[in-house]
Regions:
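Sec-dependent signal peptide recognition
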Residues: 2-10
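C-terminal motif of bacterial Sec signal peptides marking the signal peptidase cleavage site
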Residues: 14-17
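Propeptide-to-catalytic entry region of secreted or membrane-anchored zinc metalloproteases
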Residues: 19-136
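Active-site-proximal segment of zinc-dependent metalloprotease catalytic domains
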Residues: 121-200
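Surface beta-loop-beta hairpin patches that serve as ligand-binding interfaces in beta-rich domains
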Residues: 238-255
Length: 255
């Protein structure tokens, strides 16, 4: 995966396979809660129970690229273990779009804007999760983008790329890879690492910004690159957050 920052003042591409992209604009939904800020902007709102007690994840997928039920269960369990939300709902919905083999971030944002139907209102915080065929336009010979957290309540998963990557790794399952990518991207929405959730102690990889220095942590940069997934995915273990990342979340309203 690869992390991408975009703002009025700068465009910054990180050399990794997870992505973060904050779109321009500050459109508001019907509850006046902004959902077009950069990833990490809503970290405290997602983690704590102060503004929103409930979280609603709207999973939108194209035909043939629906995420596995086990992966979504892993996501729900993770949200329950790291946030203070009272109710967690994940809804899946097939969307009909013009399929492409390569998607730019502009394409992804447009797909969300046309198809997203759940927004943050009253005590419910809404998260948008897109699952697409094809691949990212940011793929290179050395990097394969598996997912991108591109707005404060939005991330995209390139499901076809995940399937292809899993098929190329002996002993690896799609569920392990898929779950890892989703949890990693969701953690960027939670503001890790130093992306809206302040660090208790410094553990940000300064070479690969917004990632943890601990190579065994879920937020380590290398495990998000599809080209490097064979280093960890074959073990059939989803990487966990390390102590520093957990402490950061706890200090910002999580657990």
């Amino acid at each position: 995966m690869r992390i991408i920052y975009r703002s009025i003042f700068l465009i910054f591409f990180l050399t990794l396979s997870c992505a973060k992209d904050d779109s321009l604009g500050n459109d508001l939904n019907n509850s006046n809660y902004t959902f077009k800020q950069q990833a990490g902007y809503s970290a405290n709102d997602i983690l704590s129970n102060e503004k929103f007690s409930d979280i609603y994840v709207e999973v939108m997928y194209v035909d043939g690229f629906k995420p596995s039920a086990e992966t979504l269960t892993n996501l729900k369990n993770f949200i329950g273990s790291r946030t203070n939300k009272t109710n967690i709902v994940i809804e899946e919905r097939l969307i009909n779009i013009t399929l492409k083999s390569i998607y730019s971030m502009e394409d992804v944002r447009s797909i969300e804007d046309v198809n997203r139907s759940i927004f943050s209102i009253e005590n419910q915080l809404a998260i948008s999760a897109l699952f697409l065929n094809g691949k990212s336009s940011s793929d290179t010979d050395t990097e394969t983008i598996l997912g991108t957290s591109y707005r404060n309540t939005s991330f995209v998963i390139f499901e076809e790329t995940i399937k292809n990557t899993a098929n190329n790794i002996l002993g690896s399952s799609k569920i392990t890879l898929e779950s890892t990518v989703i949890l990693h991207e969701f953690c960027h929405l939670l503001g890790l690492v130093n992306l809206g959730t302040n660090m208790v102690v410094n553990h940000e990889d300064t070479t690969h910004n917004a990632h943890c220095t601990n190579e065994n942590c879920l937020m380590y940069y290398l495990i998000e690159n599809g080209k490097n997934a064979h280093h960890w995915a074959k073990n059939e273990q989803i990487p966990q957050l390390d102590t520093n990342c957990i402490n950061d979340l706890r200090a910002n309203g999580g657990k």
